Amino acid sequence: MNKIELLGRLTKDVEMKQTKTGKKVATFTIAVAKNKENAIFINILAFDKLGEIAEKYLKKGRQVVIVGSLNIRDYEDKEGKKHYVTEVLAENIYFVGNSKQDEKEELPF
């Protein structure tokens, strides 16, 4: 089983990209507290409708719970050096706490 749940805050606004096959994907990073003084930064990918919702409602600083699966992929750079990327493929996104913006808008998740 490959399931992960993370609680963290967005480090910047969501960015929409397109895969080589033309699929839309929202990308963002959350900071997850390791302890009081340290955090780890996790890259998140949200595809299709979930990605569109993320782009519309998630902003820098927003606290969220991400439920998804861990993904590790590799690629070669221009010099032929292999790199590994660890990221989470989001299946669900939940808001934590309240913000004034949340009170004004009805959220679809």
What residues fall within each predicted segment?
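OB-fold and OB-like beta-barrel modules that bind single-stranded nucleic acids
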Residues: 4-12, 30, 60-71, 90-93
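Beta-rich strand-turn-strand
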Residues: 47-83
